[in-house]
Amino acid sequence: MSDTIRIALIGATGLIGTTVIGQCIGREDVRLTGIARREMKLPRGIRMELFVAEPAKWGEVIEAIRPTALICALGTTWKKAGEEEAAFRAVDLDLVLETAQAAKKLNVERFVHVSSAGADPMSGKFYLKVKGEVERELTKMRFGRLDILRPGLLVGKREGDRRPAERFGIAAAPLGNLLLHGSYRRFRAIRADSVAQAALALAKRAARGRFVHDNDGILRAAKTLPQIEHEAT
C-alpha cells in the first residue's frame, strides 16, 4: 500500500462528491475530509471527517486540515440557480475560485477540478463559457499540480434534480456514445464512478504541471487507481 495522502473534498454532497466518498470506503492510502454547506448522510464503512460550514469559513477549514490535495467537485445546476446567470456564476465561478485562492494561499500542492466537456471562455453557450472562465483563472494560480477533468454527460445516481433533457440524454447514452467519434468523443456520457476514480488517482500524483483530461484521459486515469477489496457483508 502506498503512503497515505490527505485529500480535502469540496462539493461533497453532489454526484461526483458523493461518488468520491464511496470510492474511499476501505482505502488506507487516502485520508479524506469533506467540506460542505449542509449535513449529509455518509455511506456505511467510510472513515472520514466532514466539516459543515458556510463558504466564508472554508479557508479556515482548509487551514485546519492542511491537505496535500484538494478535489473540487463544486457546482450547481441551472434549475437550482433559479435560472439566473448571476446565481449560477456565484457558485460555479466565484465560489470555486475563492476556494482555490484559499487553497493556494495555504500552500495546498495539488488541485483537481471537475469541469465539463466543451468548456471554453469564448463559448457562446453560457454554461460552457463559465466553465471555461474558471479553468482559465485556475491556470493562472499556478498550483504545483493542477488537473482539470472535462467529463461528458455524467451517469450516476443524483438527488432528484435531473432535468427532462438530461434524463433523456442518459437513457440514450449507449446509442449516443456509438455515434460520437473524433473530436466529438469528448462529449460521450461517462460514469460518475470513473470520474471519481480519476480524481482520486490524479490527486495522488506528485508530478508537477497543468493537465487537462477529456473523457478518454479520465478513463485512463481511473484505471491507475489501485483497487480495494471490500469485505463481504
Locations of regions flagged by a protein language model:
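N-terminal Rossmann NAD(P)H-binding glycine-rich loop of SDR-like oxidoreductase domains
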Residues: 2-27
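Oxidoreductase cofactor-interface core, primarily capturing Rossmann-like NAD(P)-dependent enzymes
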Residues: 5, 27, 121-229
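SDR active-site strand-loop-helix element
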Residues: 10, 35, 73-74, 111-117, ...
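Conserved Rossmann-fold NAD(P)-dependent oxidoreductase catalytic core, especially the SDR/UDP-sugar
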Residues: 15, 84-135, 140, 144-149
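N-terminal Rossmann-fold cofactor-binding loop
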Residues: 28, 34-39, 54
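Short loop/helix-cap segments at secondary-structure boundaries that form the rim of catalytic
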Residues: 38-47
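NAD(P)H-binding glycine-rich loop region in Rossmannoid oxidoreductase-like domains
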Residues: 48-98, 102-105
